From Swiss-Prot:
Its EC number is 2.8.4.4. Residues 370-437 form the TRAM domain. Catalyzes the methylthiolation of an aspartic acid residue of ribosomal protein uS12. The keyword Glycoprotein does not apply. This is Ribosomal protein uS12 methylthiotransferase RimO. The keyword Transit peptide does not apply. GO terms for molecular function: 4 iron, 4 sulfur cluster binding; aspartic acid methylthiotransferase activity; metal ion binding; protein methylthiotransferase activity. GO terms for biological process: tRNA modification. [4Fe-4S] cluster 1 binds at C18, C56, C90.
């Protein structure tokens, strides 16, 4: 990157954090190019002279990664390699005043929902007509669709409402327009994301309207899979399950972070649901949508978690046998309700408990995968790597779930295509198979 005072603006967008941040960066990329500005995402070239860093501020590790990235580009600026640095996203939303004071080399800081303000720095205007033209940074056959911004939930451990604000649903017509635009470019899978999918519509339609959104997206020609991520258990709209069972292009998959298996801990976490009601909901979901893959996450070591609470979490995971599960150690975050509670559990103990949960899940996953041997699944192939074509079934999200491996030695499939794969071997988190007609 070589800075020249009168050089034409060339922008590199750097994204940290979750898929919701990725969508924000894709929207910025689309708007910049739509205004005639040269822009790339995660550019490996050295010809950009302006960098926009879209930060994450969710937990300590994410905050540190964001800070390290900003400092790296500040060093580049001080060495004359770039002209301007703009910082956006959750970290600058949360700590804008502190960052302006500590990082004067950054030209401007923006919060999580300030796309028009960022564009003004480039003398560009927000063009609503580009809503259906979003440029993707993922492989073109799948795309994340953010159906809402912000969150109204009061979870004790989470600072998202501080960083992202109140829940705001995206109008259904805009989401359908996005889906049609993506389908026209060859996108086959839509992954619906939000801080809380199940709240969709309450603000603009005065009712939970996820089921109607699913129907409308399901009708878009060319979309083979629609996947739900980040559903909230309390107040889950059961009519979503009816649509999922009826529509063949809605994946039999749900990502529902449950966070714990102890009623006492769920109360401390302010989740609005206890263990018995959670168990009833899981049973209802599995009864209404046979064969559904249930993904969840758990938080380990929240203030107040006793050994008894942790034992209850272990028994909960063992009894429910989730198809996919992630476990994360509690991070003591400012601007959260639980920050006022003493973080008494040592990090080492949190990590030991986390390892115990993941060991339990590893055994469950191995048993569930073993039962898939001999079955044939429709697989969407994402990439070729290390002598294998690697794809996913409808029961798996990109990057976080199981993968299906097919040897590239004597078989071929085009990336982004579907193929039927017969499973002939299984590991804890991977399946191995061969393409069949």
């Amino acid at each position: 990157m070589k800075a020249k005072g009168n050089q034409k603006t060339k922008v590199n967008i750097v994204t940290l954090g979750c898929s919701k941040n990725l969508v924000d960066s894709e929207n910025l990329l689309t708007q910049l190019r739509g205004n005639g500005i040269e822009a790339e995402h995660e550019s490996k070239n050295d010809n950009s002279n302006v960098v926009v860093i879209n930060t994450c501020g969710f937990i300590d590790n994410a905050k540190q990664e964001s800070i390290d990235t900003i400092l790296r580009y500040i060093d580049a600026k001080e060495n004359g390699l770039i002209d301007k640095i703009y910082v956006s996203g959750c970290l600058s939303q949360r700590y804008k005043d502190d960052m302006e004071r500590e990082m004067p080399q950054v030209d401007a800081f923006f919060g999580s929902n300030e796309l028009p303000a960022i564009l003004k720095k480039f003398r560009a205007d927000y063009k609503h007509e580009l809503v259906g033209e979003r440029l993707l940074t993922t492989p073109s056959h799948y795309a994340y669709v953010k159906i809402a911004e912000g969150c109204d939930r009061p979870c004790s451990f989470c600072a998202i409402p501080v960083m992202r604000g109140k829940h705001v649903s995206t109008p259904m017509e805009d989401l359908v327009k996005q889906a049609k635009g993506m389908a026209a470019k060859g996108t086959k899978e839509l992954i619906l994301i939000a801080q809380d999918l199940t709240y969709y519509g309450l603000d603009i339609y005065k009712k939970r309207n996820l089921s109607d959104l699913l129907k409308n997206l399901s009708d878009v020609e060319g979309i083979d899979w629609i996947r739900l991520q980040y559903a909230y258990p309390s107040g889950f709209p059961l009519d979503v399950l009816d649509v999922m069972a009826e529509r063949s292009n809605i994946c039999k998959y749900i990502d529902m972070p449950l966070q714990h298996g102890s009623s006492d801990m769920l109360k401390l976490m302010r989740r609005g649901i206890d263990r018995p009601k959670t168990e009833d909901l899981i049973k209802t979901i599995r009864d209404k949508v046979p064969g559904i893959a249930f993904r969840t996450t758990m938080i380990i070591g929240h203030p107040g978690e006793t050994e008894k609470d942790f034992d209850e979490l272990c028994s909960f995971v063992e009894e429910q046998r989730f198809d996919r599960l992630g476990a994360f150690t509690y991070s003591h975050e400012e601007h959260t309700h639980s920050y006022s509670m003493e973080d008494t559990i040592p990090q080492e103990e949190k990590e030991e408990r986390q390892a115990t949960i993941m060991s339990i899940q590893e055994g469950i996953s191995a048993e569930l995968n073993e039962k898939k041997i001999g079955n044939t699944y429709k697989v969407l192939f994402d990439r070729k790597e290390g002598g294998y074509f690697i794809g996913r079934t409808e029961h798996d999200s990109p990057e976080v779930d199981n993968e299906v491996m097919v040897s590239a030695k004597d078989q071929y499939v085009r990336i982004g295509d579907f193929a039927n794969v017969k499973i002939n071997d299984a590991a804890e988190f991977d399946l191995f198979g061969e393409i069949v007609k």
